């Protein structure tokens, strides 16, 4: 779509020192090997796994192609040597800002981030289970942890992040 072309062009212009890589089904296997995943898993959940696998393996920045940048990302990347990850959180879903609901349309992390590794492993456990959509249904204190998260069976990756963040304290900005 033309909006994506505009956003990618802008990212390349604003972040001229960065390599912008556009992924598609024909070039994805040049970067990662996806595990066997049921054909019942929605494309959005496969995309969630892809972004986590790429960030874990290569570090750097994942941005959805429809993000329009107005400035370079140095204000984020300059902090990554001291932090596990940079994430945005959902104002709509977060009821307690001490426990923000992490978004995944923009993720920045150094290579080897424990948080990203653990998030990916948790999410992979969910989507390779026999019933991914109900994987977190029996989660202890589920309503407390999910706060205002709508469509939990669609936003499984968000729940995986919640689970990981509840297990251990990470240095995330």
Task: Outline where the language-model segments fall.
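Glycosyltransferase-associated regions of secretory-pathway enzymes
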Residues: 1-48, 65-173
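Small-residue hinge/turn detector
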Residues: 48-60
């Amino acid at each position: 779509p033309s909006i994506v072309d505009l956003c990618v062009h802008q990212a390349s212009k604003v972040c001229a020192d960065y390599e912008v890589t556009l992924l598609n089904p024909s070039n994805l296997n040049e970067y990662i090997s996806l595990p066997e995943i049921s054909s019942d898993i929605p494309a959005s959940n496969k995309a969630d796994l892809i972004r986590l696998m790429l960030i874990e393996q290569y570090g750097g920045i994942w941005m959805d192609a429809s993000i329009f940048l107005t400035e370079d990302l140095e204000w984020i990347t300059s902090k990554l040597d001291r932090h596990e990850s940079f994430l945005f959180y959902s104002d709509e879903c977060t009821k307690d800002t001490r426990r923000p609901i992490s978004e995944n349309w923009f993720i920045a992390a150094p290579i080897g981030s424990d948080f990203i590794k653990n998030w990916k492993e948790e999410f992979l456990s969910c989507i390779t289970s026999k019933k991914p959509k109900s994987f977190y249904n029996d989660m202890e204190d589920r309503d407390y942890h999910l706060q205002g998260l709508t469509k939990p069976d669609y936003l499984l990756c968000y729940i995986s992040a919640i689970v990981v963040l509840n297990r251990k304290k990470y240095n995330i900005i």
